[in-house]
């Protein structure tokens, strides 16, 4: 896995068309939690409603708190061998299949089982959030111009959308296949493991694609040493805090709140879907059609959104 010193010029064909395969795997993986976690806790593991509330609240609060520090962690920690961000595409993703599958392992419906699954939820999210942030950061590193960054972002969104569409059929089908082989109790853990492995493989593909685009750990340390010496001569530059950035750009706060609202509705509707089709409509097979239609409409809405935004901006100017 050693990197040579040759720096690629422009975006490679693999980056242009396959930047996002890891995000496709990430979408497949995370949707197992979105659609089946609550069902597993209540119907398979048979935890009480109070226990589920405590488990999910603890894991969600810790995840929210830690999410505020992942970026700072990556920026402050000593860069690893293959680069500050690129290295994390292979350092922790391989842990995710094991940690994530543990979230869907039934031990007991008592305290021990609740603690085991809660720890699995917390640790699995740490293991996948760090490479997720590093993966997004690599867009600004690999893309040297605004056009290149837009192309990488577009490719990533295409693969993410592709993941949501294929999950509509692959997700429920994988659970059904593993249920027939391993039983329903173990089907969700097996599906989580396989989809997490696909995510890890996709991130490894990103690692290979971005070879040469980011300076290695040794190269960055040399550069930082030179910059530190230059700062001593020229004086310290002014630093802008996160709160200062929000104060200068208040629209960022509204964007943040709108995204939170969007995901609250998304997770609530998707999480309740399996209950509706199982107990209300009495036809669980309809879940596949619902997922396909919802994900397809989300792609159409995302495509139309850029035209709506452009029209609104045109009216303002």
What does each of the following model-derived ranges do?
Residues 2-230, 234-317:
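Membrane-embedded alpha-helical bundles of multi-pass transporters/translocases
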